[in-house]
Amino acid sequence: MSVQGPRLVLDIRALTPNLRRPLIMCLVDHLLGSDATETIVVISDHEPAGLGYQLELRRETRGRVGFSYDQRLDGAWVALISLKP
């Protein structure tokens, strides 16, 4: 998993669970609305498969973002949300 170009790193491990997903969606929506090209790197303490599923289901983001994730050696999960042009 590699990131090329500008990236925004968001470590959500210290946030309460009820704030995590809304914060990520708000950030993705804002960047999509501003024609940004950053890749969002989300660091989490659990597998983020549900986040990718939600991005595909949402009307606002469906087909407009790429999503992949992997687990680091230290146990943290890293998800990449890439904005499609």
What are the functions of these language-model segments?
Residues 27-36, 40-69:
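Short, hydrophobic/π-rich interface segment
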Residues 3-5, 60-62, 72-74:
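A generic structural signal for short, non-catalytic loop/turn and secondary-structure boundary residues
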Residues 64-85:
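C-terminal edge-of-domain segments
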Residues 18-23, 50, 75-77:
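Residues in flexible loops and secondary-structure boundaries
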Residues 1-35:
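An N-terminal amphipathic alpha-helical segment
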Residues 9, 39, 78:
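A residue-level signal for beta-strand positions that form part of recognition/binding surfaces
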